[in-house]
Design a protein with these regions (language model features):
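C-terminal substrate-binding subdomain of Rossmann-fold SDR/epimerase-dehydratase oxidoreductases
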Residues: 85-220
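Conserved active-site helix of classical SDR/Rossmann-fold NAD(P)-dependent CH-OH oxidoreductases
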Residues: 41-48, 52, 78-81, 110, ...
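Short coil/turn segments at alpha/beta junctions that flank glycine-rich nucleotide-binding fingerprints
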Residues: 2-3, 53-57, 73-74, 87, ...
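N-terminal Rossmann-like NAD(P)+-binding domain of SDR-like oxidoreductases, especially those catalyzing
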Residues: 1-66, 146, 195, 199-207, ...
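Active-site proximal helix/loop that lines the substrate pocket
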Residues: 12-15, 65, 71, 117, ...
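Short beta-loop-alpha junction of Rossmann-like oxidoreductase domains
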Residues: 19-20, 69-75
């Protein structure tokens, strides 16, 4: 009636909660460990209900841990980069033990465009992830290595999630995205992650970009 060709609904890897098995496939149990993930699970259900009830051409995309230029200052990668860029030797972060599946923003954007264009993905839930797992601690160390500095890492209790809401492990199975969307990573694996971090660091090296971030303040 409205001429809608496709609806691509943005979900999140957070709907899976702490991984019960890895890599995480799209049929992994959903676990609302936080109000945020609970609302996303609800939104996913509403989106899929329109597909079932009205044949609306819906695809649900679940991106894992996207990073890159212009990311929110609350995320770990810009938090670490901006602190180091402002010549702080002691870098303050949250929990260091959880693992994540980080994805450079251009890979994720290409995945969304592919989902928009794909007929085969209608009525499907699709993970967009790198299939590469790394801990927060190793991520911080990698950033410091790329920026050529030695740092002390300090955990700030203010930056810790409530214990039961912390997602301890995320690691995506991206085989469905490859199969249905023809999606391939340009920034995959450790080397790809390092290249994405390097490009992100270069963006923050511009003084006009860096000044938009308050490295000493953690905004809730």
């Amino acid at each position: 009636e409205l001429g809608i060709e496709k609806v691509v609904h943005t979900s999140t890897s957070e709907v899976y909660g702490t991984a019960k098995f890895v890599p995480i496939t799209e049929d992994h149990p959903l676990q609302p460990q936080s109000p945020y993930s609970a609302t996303k699970i609800g939104a996913d259900s509403i989106a899929m209900s329109f597909y079932h009830a009205f044949d609306m051409p819906v695809t649900i995309v679940r991106p894992f841990n996207t990073f890159g230029p212009r990311q929110s200052a609350r995320a770990i990668i810009p938090t670490v980069i901006t602190q180091i860029a402002n010549r702080k030797n002691k870098v303050t972060v949250g929990a260091l033990h959880p693992t994540r599946d980080f994805n450079y923003v251009t890979d994720i954007v290409r995945g969304f465009i592919a989902a928009m264009r794909s007929i085969e993905s209608i009525g499907e839930v699709i993970n967009l992830g790198s299939n590469y797992e790394i801990s927060m601690a190793d991520t911080v160390k990698l950033i410091a290595d790329i920026m050529g500095v030695e740092i002390q890492i300090e955990t700030d209790p203010v930056r810790l999630r409530p214990e039961k809401s912390e997602v301890e492990r995320l690691w995506a199975d991206n085989s469905k995205a490859k199969r249905l969307l023809g999606w391939e990573l340009h920034y995959g694996g450790l080397n790809g992650f390092a290249r994405g971090l390097t490009e992100t660091i270069q963006w923050f090296a511009d003084a006009d970009n860096l000044k938009k971030y308050k490295s000493g303040i953690y905004n809730l």
